[in-house]
């Protein structure tokens, strides 16, 4: 009897397991994903970080004469794992300074070494300083110009307790005759300065001769402030020595060769450096450690026949952030022309629960609709579901469907989030070259850019799960073939329908928020804009997937009917939103205006075409602040072409910060002012047309753009 019950229980469990497998779907087969799960190693990825940056070290000047230790290590491991075409490339960029000695002392009322650059490299803000100087310490509070008024700082060190802005404090101090500045370097004045009082955030100050700037933790700054408040005379000694060294963009390139059936290629990687003095285990090296493991696992699975050999050559890039990617693409235009997508891994390895974090994928912006987003999202959500214990499957045991953990890692939940675009990493640069790219990142990161960004914050389980997602997504993009391309297009279509539904939900919420008839009619316009905008984006996504097919030139013939079907989805959702409009019109005692006429302001905006006064680029107008230039042009963190910075230019009228990167791109597309307004309102939230016009007028005044009246349509000749 017991044996029969046992066999029956196994049968039930088998049925349940089958149901789980049917529910959990992604773009690769269950067998392929299971092979990836079994091979990808979070422990190896963590070992890579321990090889690359086991601690934050002071780089010896001799490294600038050859290759950096991180480059040599990752190149050696790539060769060991079977990557091909492994090379370290250098692009000289002039001269820079490397600190070799840095000691900050209190000499009275007692001798105390406060910081040593070899203990905390971030403590030396003035990385070019060469001086042995001593002076009394004086408190200048927040370090504003008013704080310096009437204060004699000549020959002294100043102490600032402002949470940031050490460079400005130093400049004011030295201008007033001070020999140096000590100030807090933290991420804002909020919880982080309280929760992490010993943390120093990386900052750089260019020092004048015989002066120095030191970055303090919030705790150390308060200790010094307390001593001064007690009336104690505090004397500071700063000892600094730095050497001028040849600067360069250094990167490591490696490949997994395609099968030769296509000239197309793909890219994946992270930044090995973000400057050569600042280092970090998560924000610098985790993406490189992860993608090195992704490549190792992929190569082994190909060799074992568990994954097909890629049709497209895979380029692994481990670079100086942004500028290194740009240097490589400029040096290899043949590669830039054939890469069809990039997976950028920026900060990947935190134990999520320690940092209140999610593992996030930042989508491409709506100005760059792409197939690539849904590949990453499908893989992330698949792994997240597998690792989640689902109560409806408890008959199979109180456990996740698949245990995706590392031997020495956590057993935490896998918190993932698909988020709107943000820039400030290498995916921005790829998009500036016309290559779709997404970024994966753990955020928030309580230790990034700081003295506490060290390997002890990392989790080998997080590495393993991220490696499974990354390997799966890479295999989809690299493998090719019409069958897999069709899977991606189908995924794009279905997820696109969901996103149009989200746009409808935004629109109907605008209607529900309306408290007057006038507001309701305006909300109906906004609702229509939101739904229509998302539909246009999704048509672009479908079209973009054509590059994955064996014959991309013939793909539009197959994809056009699918794109056209999206218009019917938009029409249906607009019609159902119209019913909600009627509901709220009755509530407010007004009649719906199904086709609202344009206001005089909208007519004027529709008639004004935005043109660049200079060169129009992929990223916007070349002269536009924050536009970042075009293909191969210069630019920094958060530049256009998918940048994440303000992009607002000089002081004056400005849109909300999160809209400005897209605005910069839209300026170069020869759209009307109304089309720009509708695009921003559709992608984000309704923005007043008057605000958009004020920003455009301000840009016109600065000479960045010109507003040109739309040419009148040709007169229709009357029939005789």
Q: Where do the model's predicted regions map?
A:
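Short amphipathic alpha-helical interface segments
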Residues: 622-626, 654-685
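His/Asp/Glu-rich mid-to-C-terminal helical/loop segments that flank catalytic regions of hydrolases
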Residues: 300, 312, 385, 446-497, ...
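Soluble metallo-hydrolase cores and metallopeptidase-like ectodomains found primarily
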Residues: 29, 107-108, 116-150, 201-281, ...
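Noncatalytic luminal/extracellular "stalk/propeptide" segments of secretory-pathway proteins
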Residues: 21-31, 35-38, 42-43, 47-154, ...
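Metal-dependent peptidase/peptidase-like ectodomains
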Residues: 39-40, 111-114, 211-214, 221-222, ...
């Amino acid at each position: 009897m017991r044996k029969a019950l046992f066999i029956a229980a196994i049968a039930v469990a088998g049925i349940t397991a089958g149901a789980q497998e049917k529910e959990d779907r992604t773009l690769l087969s269950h067998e392929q994903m299971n092979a990836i799960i079994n091979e990808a190693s979070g422990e190896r990825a963590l070992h890579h970080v321990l090889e690359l940056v086991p601690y934050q070290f002071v780089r010896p000047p001799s490294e600038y004469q050859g290759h950096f230790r991180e480059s040599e290590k990752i190149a050696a491991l790539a060769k060991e794992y079977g990557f091909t075409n492994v090379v370290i490339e250098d692009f000289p960029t002039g001269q820079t300074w490397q600190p070799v000695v840095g000691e900050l002392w209190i000499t009275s009322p007692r001798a105390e070494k406060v910081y040593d650059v070899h203990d905390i490299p971030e403590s030396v803000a003035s990385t070019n300083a060469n001086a042995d100087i001593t002076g009394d310490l004086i408190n200048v509070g927040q370090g504003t110009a008013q704080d310096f008024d009437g204060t004699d700082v000549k020959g002294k060190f100043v102490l600032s307790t402002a949470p940031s802005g050490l460079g400005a404090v130093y400049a004011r101090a030295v201008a007033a005759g001070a020999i140096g500045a000590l100030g807090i370097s933290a991420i804002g004045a909020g919880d982080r300065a309280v929760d992490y009082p010993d943390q120093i955030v990386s900052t750089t100050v260019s020092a004048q001769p015989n002066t120095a700037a030191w970055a303090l933790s919030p705790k150390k700054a308060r200790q010094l402030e307390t001593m001064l408040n007690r009336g104690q005379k505090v004397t500071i000694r700063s000892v600094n020595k730095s050497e001028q060294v040849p600067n360069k963009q250094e990167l490591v390139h490696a490949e997994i060769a395609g099968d030769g059936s296509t000239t197309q290629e793909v890219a994946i990687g992270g930044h090995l450096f973000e400057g050569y003095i600042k280092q970090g285990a998560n924000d610098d090296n985790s993406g490189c450690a992860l993608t090195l493991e992704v490549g190792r696992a992929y190569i082994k699975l190909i060799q074992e026949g568990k994954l097909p050999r890629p049709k497209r050559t895979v380029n692994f890039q481990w670079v100086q952030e942004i500028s290194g990617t740009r240097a490589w693409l400029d040096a290899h235009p043949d590669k830039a022309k054939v890469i069809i997508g990039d997976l950028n891994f920026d900060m990947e390895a935190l134990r999520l629960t320690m940092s209140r974090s999610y593992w996030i994928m930042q989508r491409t912006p709506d100005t760059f609709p792409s197939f690539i987003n849904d590949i990453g999202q499908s893989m992330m959500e698949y792994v997240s579901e597998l690792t989640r214990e689902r109560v409806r499957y408890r008959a199979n045991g109180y456990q996740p469907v698949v245990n995706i953990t590392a031997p020495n890692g956590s057993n935490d939940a896998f918190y993932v989030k698909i988020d709107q675009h943000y820039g400030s990493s290498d995916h921005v640069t790829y998009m500036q070259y016309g290559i779709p790219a997404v970024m994966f990142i753990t955020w928030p990161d309580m230790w990034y850019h700081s003295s506490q960004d060290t390997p002890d914050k990392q989790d080998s389980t997080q590495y393993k799960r991220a490696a499974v997602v990354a390997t799966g997504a890479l295999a989809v993009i690299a493998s090719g073939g019409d069958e897999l391309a069709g899977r991606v297009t189908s995924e794009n279509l279905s997820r696109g329908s969901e996103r149009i539904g989200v746009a409808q939900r935004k629109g109907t919420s605008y209607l529900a928020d309306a408290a007057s008839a006038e507001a309701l009619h305006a909300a109906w316009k906004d609702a229509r804009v939101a739904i229509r905008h998302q539909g246009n984006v999704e048509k672009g996504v479908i079209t973009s997937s054509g590059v994955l097919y064996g014959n991309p030139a013939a793909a539009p013939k197959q994809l056009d009917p699918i794109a056209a079907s999206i218009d019917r989805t938009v029409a249906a959702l607009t019609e159902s939103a119209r019913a909600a409009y009627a509901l709220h019109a009755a509530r407010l005692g007004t009649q719906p205006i199904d086709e609202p006429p344009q206001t005089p302001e909208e007519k004027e905006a529709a008639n004004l075409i935005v043109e660049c006064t200079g060169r129009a680029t992929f990223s916007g107008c070349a002269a536009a602040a924050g536009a970042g230039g075009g293909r191969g042009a210069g630019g920094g963190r958060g530049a256009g072409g998918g940048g994440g910075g303000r992009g607002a230019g000089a002081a004056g009228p400005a849109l909300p910060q999160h809209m400005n990167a897209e605005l910069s791109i839209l300026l170069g597309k020869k759209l009307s002012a109304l089309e720009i307004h509708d695009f921003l309102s559709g992608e984000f939230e309704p923005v007043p047309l008057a605000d958009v016009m004020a920003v455009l007028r301000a840009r016109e005044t600065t000479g960045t753009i010109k507003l040109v009246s739309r040419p009148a349509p040709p007169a229709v000749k009357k029939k005789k």
